[in-house]
């Protein structure tokens, strides 16, 4: 049984809450953009972190994802976690923790930041600071 919120469910939730139609960014599976009623642009990034054997989630935020999120008026990240939990954060809040000293590189993701997600905070590999967060349990878009 899949206990993760689907990407489609996230889109329905976000579009309803933000009163905005979101379209997929070309060639980007988890990035969506729209224009809210104020005329500002909105970008949503919704990765599905993996559970680490040590009991936290991990996900990479790539330099390309960061570029797209930086080019919008409002950037939001909706992390889809096991147990139908959702973690929603503003890009401007997260990017303060994504320093140049924390950047990693590999052939697959290229330049990226590695995020470790816990129930009450996010830890970026290479950064001693933690970002406090609060998980939300998702039941349905109704």
Describe the role of every protein-language-model region:
Residues 1-40, 48-50:
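Acidic-basic catalytic patches of nuclease active cores, encompassing PD-(D/E)XK
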Residues 4-5, 92-142:
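Non-catalytic C-terminal interaction segments of nucleic acid-processing enzymes
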Residues 13-26, 56-59, 100-107:
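Short, solvent-exposed secondary-structure boundary motifs
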Residues 30-32, 77, 113:
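Residue-level detector of beta-strand structural context in well-folded domains
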Residues 37, 70, 82, 106-110, ...:
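A generic structural signal for short, non-catalytic loop/turn and secondary-structure boundary residues
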Residues 40-41, 123:
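Short, solvent-exposed loop/turn motifs
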Residues 48-87, 91:
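Catalytic cores of nucleic-acid endonucleases
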């Amino acid at each position: 049984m899949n206990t993760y919120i689907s990407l489609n469910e996230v889109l329905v939730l976000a579009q309803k809450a933000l009163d905005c139609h979101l379209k997929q960014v070309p060639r980007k599976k988890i990035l969506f953009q729209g224009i809210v009623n104020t005329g500002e642009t909105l970008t949503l990034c919704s990765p599905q972190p993996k559970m680490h054997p040590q009991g936290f989630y991990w996900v990479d935020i790539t330099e390309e994802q960061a570029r797209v999120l930086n080019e919008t008026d409002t950037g939001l990240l909706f992390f889809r976690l096991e147990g139908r939990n959702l973690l929603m954060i503003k890009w401007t809040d997260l990017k303060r923790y994504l320093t140049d000293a924390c950047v990693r590189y590999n052939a697959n993701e290229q330049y990226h930041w590695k995020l470790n997600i816990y129930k009450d905070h996010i830890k970026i590999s290479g950064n001693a600071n933690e970002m406090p967060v609060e998980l939300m349990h998702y039941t349905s878009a109704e």
